[in-house]
Design a protein with these regions (language model features):
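N-terminal Rossmann-like NAD(P)+-binding domain of SDR-like oxidoreductases, especially those catalyzing
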Residues: 1-178, 248, 299, 307-315, ...
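Short, hydrophobic alpha-helical segments
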Residues: 228-232, 259, 312-316
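A short C-terminal helix-loop "cap" of Rossmann-like NAD(P)-dependent dehydrogenase/epimerase domains
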Residues: 48-54, 166-169, 193-204, 230, ...
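Substrate-binding strand-loop-helix patch
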Residues: 181-186, 209-221, 237-257, 273, ...
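Hydrophobic "lid"/C-terminal helical patch
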Residues: 17, 192, 221-228, 252-255, ...
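Glycine/proline-rich active-site loop of Rossmann-fold NAD(P)-dependent oxidoreductases
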Residues: 153, 178-191, 198-201, 217-218, ...
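C-terminal "lid/loop" region of Rossmann-like NAD(P)-dependent oxidoreductases
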Residues: 207, 236-238, 247-253, 260-281, ...
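Residue-level signal for the nucleotide or nucleotide-sugar donor/cofactor binding architecture
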Residues: 62, 91, 99-102, 146, ...
Length: 326
């Protein structure tokens, strides 16, 4: 079986992808963010029998030498390492350029030099901005509505340029909003669940009118692997989406009904995006991934929410419910 590197393996989607790859028999190398505590993020929570199967490389995606060293001897790379919090990108855009654009450049250059068989570069539905039409297919225009989305657009275009200029075997993987166990409370679903499970009677949220297309994380991980395993995806940009949308307000009401029907939603102004930066509608098309791969959505939204609530209930100690997680 192929040897693969997962950058950002210590994060939310990356840790689930790492697990899914192990289950499919891949030889997995995990690139985690170096820290002096020698912690490996969410990988530390995996059972020992799984963790023992993973080769861990701690480094910094911004360091080209470390990235190159990590990529030596691997057949394929799943590049997920990134800064992803939109509110923090308003405060620290420089760090997003360094991590998301330069980090991707480091992966692409190393892949070119090392002759890597295939590279999956992770995009985001945020590159589309507010939908100009729905469902949003891969031909939809890009709109940089936040420093975060602008850096992901830049990373996508770098990946495209390396495919066109150097014939580098790249696939751009574009998941719509993903949720599930291990997600931080900077994302809306765990924000709602953690406040409710902490016994809050008032659930603080930002704007309730935007709509989103939510993937359960195990379906997202399966999408990455399906794109990697298909010979038809090189040079392509591919959505992972459910073609189902729900407003943040309706989402909150559904979760509140399951945990504490007496809770009320209140607007917390610090959670509101600047008006022109708010992405008001995201509803993705998934015809292309179904055409080029054998991917199919396996989890309903309701199943995913149930699994997420159950996991967070068992792991509330990992969350700080009294602060706004930027």
């Amino acid at each position: 079986m192929k040897k693969v590197l997962v950058t950002g393996a210590d994060g939310f989607i990356g840790s689930h992808l790492t697990e899914s790859l192990l289950e499919k028999g891949y030889d997995v190398k995990a690139f985690t963010y170096y820290n002096s505590f020698n912690t490996w993020g969410w990988l530390d929570t995996l059972p020992k029998e799984k963790l023992n199967q993973i080769e861990v490389f701690s480094g910094d995606i911004r360091d080209p030498n470390g990235v190159r060293e990590a990529m030596k001897g691997v057949d394929q790379v799943f590049h997920l390492a990134a800064l992803i919090a939109i509110p923090f990108s308003y405060h620290s855009p420089d760090s997003y350029v360094d991590t998301n654009i330069k980090g991707t450049l480091n992966v692409l250059q190393a892949a070119r030099d090392l002759g890597t068989e295939k590279i999956m570069v992770t995009s985001t539905s945020e590159v589309y901005g507010t939908a100009q039409y729905v469902p949003i297919d891969e031909k939809h225009p890009f709109q940089g509505q936040s420093p975060y989305s602008a850096t992901k657009i830049g990373a996508d275009r770098l990946a495209e340029s390396f495919y066109r200029s150097f014939n580098l075997p790249v696939a751009i993987v574009r998941p719509f909003n993903t949720f599930g166990p291990r997600q931080s409370a900077r994302a809306v679903i765990p924000t709602i669940i953690t406040q409710l499970l902490a016994g809050k009677e008032e659930i603080k949220l930002g704007s309730l009118t935007p709509t989103r297309d939510f993937n359960y994380v195990k379906d997202t991980a399966a999408g990455f692997i399906a794109i990697a395993e298909s010979d038809k995806t090189i040079g392509q940009e591919i959505n992972i989406a459910t073609q189902r949308e729900i407003s943040i307000g309706d989402l909150a009401k559904e979760i509140i009904a399951q945990i504490n029907p007496d809770a009320k939603i209140v607007c917390d102004e610090q959670r509101l995006r600047p008006k022109k930066s708010e992405v008001n509608r995201l509803l993705g098309a998934n015809a292309k991934i179904k055409e080029l791969t054998d991917w199919k959505q396996q989890y309903t939204f309701e199943q995913g929410i149930a699994e997420t609530i159950a996991w967070i209930r068992q792991n509330m100690a990992a969350y700080k419910t009294d602060i706004y997680n930027v």
